[in-house]
A protein has these predicted regions:
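Hydrophobic h-region of N-terminal signal peptides that target proteins for export
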Residues: 8-20
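Short Gly/Thr/Asp-enriched flexible loops that form oxyanion-binding sites at enzyme active sites
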Residues: 108-130, 272-281
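Internal gly/pro-rich beta-alpha loop/helix module
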Residues: 135-207
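Bacterial N-terminal signal peptides that target proteins for export
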Residues: 1-8
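ATP/NTP phosphate-donor binding region
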Residues: 21-96, 278
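Short, acidic/small-residue loops that bind anionic groups at enzyme active sites
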Residues: 119-150, 156-160, 285-294
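C-terminal non-catalytic interaction/assembly regions of soluble proteins
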Residues: 269-349
Length: 349
């Protein structure tokens, strides 16, 4: 009888511990405005990447009620200084963490300038369906009405939601949940700067709970062909901006510098000024992959529209803007130099 009571007591204690166990969330800090400090609380002049991960966590103690939180500082930079080397380190570290049963989700604090690019890169290279959430702020940590603390709280709340699993990499900003592929920064100052493009937001956060309205359409994370685990560098890809009477010199400079690919941010439907077009044809013949995109803020770049892509072996970016087309082209070039296969990647991802 005593043995039975002891066993029941042990089971009760074990059940209690299991019920009280919180999800384990790792926060990786990379800098940005969320870690910035301004000259005064009312100033918009500030230095990004001044506050460390521990200070960020201590500023939002409420996240400790949501999850078992731990943090690490990968870098502490303004995201205008984000680069391929940091991307590779970040992707490898997240994959390492999520491969461990002791980590349920990862939150990445990041500057907003290039957050959409980092999010898309991770969306193509993370090999787990566990939640990965990018979060930042538009106001520095000591500003009046700083948005960083609320954004970080919402990001952790999203990370622990069972509904977030399998959603790909997300950006959590201003109470909204945005798809890594479609998210875009649209304003230099507004806290509501991030938008979801024509497809809109994936969901929102309210009272510490994530609510989803739709799922991502394109393949991501575990569904992609890209593996960066053994990569030490990425192919070199540049972007050339289109405009009236555009010069071919920037494109020629990329070719002369040995770049592997160039994204043309063309006018309208990815159209290219004649001198730049001629330079692009020559570049493609030299083995430099050309991707046509558009400088327009919305709308796809049509395959074989006004430009005969099949004839010149160009790739159309479809619904990717120039900066995200660059990300996908870099990864595509780690797998193939065949323009037809690269076009398929743009259709899939």
């Amino acid at each position: 009888m005593k043995t039975l009571k002891a066993l029941l007591l042990l089971l009760a204690v074990t059940a209690s511990v299991l019920l009280e166990a919180k999800p384990k969330v790792r926060i990786i800090a990379t800098g940005g405005t969320i870690a910035g400090i301004s000259q005064s609380a009312a100033s918009t002049v500030y230095k990004p990447g001044q506050v460390g991960i521990q200070t960020l966590i201590e500023a939002v103690p409420q996240i400790l009620d949501l999850a078992d939180i731990s943090g690490e500082q990968l870098v502490n930079i303004g995201s205008q200084d984000m680069n391929d080397a940091v991307w590779l380190r970040l992707a490898k570290r997240i994959n390492e963490l999520l491969d461990d049963d002791d980590c349920d989700a990862v939150v990445v604090t990041h500057g907003t300038d290039t957050m959409e690019e980092t999010a898309y890169f991770l969306n193509l290279t993370i090999k787990s369906d566990k939640p990965v959430i990018l979060v930042g702020s538009m106001r520095p940590s000591n500003a009046l009405s700083a948005d960083g603390p609320a954004n970080l709280y919402n990001a952790v709340a999203t990370a622990i939601s069972p509904q977030s699993r399998g959603m790909g990499v997300l950006c959590c900003m201003n109470n909204q949940l945005l798809d890594a592929k479609t998210v875009i920064k649209t304003h230099t100052l507004d806290s509501d700067t991030f938008k979801g493009g024509p497809s809109g937001i994936l969901g929102y956060v309210h009272n510490g709970e994530a609510f989803y309205l739709q799922r991502p359409v394109n393949k991501h994370t575990v569904q992609t062909a890209f593996d960066v685990s053994d990569l030490e560098e990425l192919p070199k890809v540049g972007i050339v901006y289109g405009y009236a009477n555009a010069s071919p010199l920037p494109l020629q400079a990329f070719v002369d510098a040995g770049f592997d690919g160039v994204v043309l941010a063309g006018v309208g439907d990815g159209n290219i000024y004649k001198d730049v077009f001629d330079a692009a044809v020559k570049a493609q013949k030299k083995g430099v992959q050309i991707v046509r995109s558009s400088r327009c803020s919305a709308g796809p770049t049509s395959l074989d529209g006004e430009v005969d892509d099949a004839k010149y072996h160009f790739v159309a970016s479809l619904d990717l803007n120039p900066q995200k087309a660059r990300v996908l082209l870099m990864l595509a070039l780690t797998k193939t130099r065949d323009w037809k296969r690269i076009q398929q990647y743009f259709e899939e991802y």
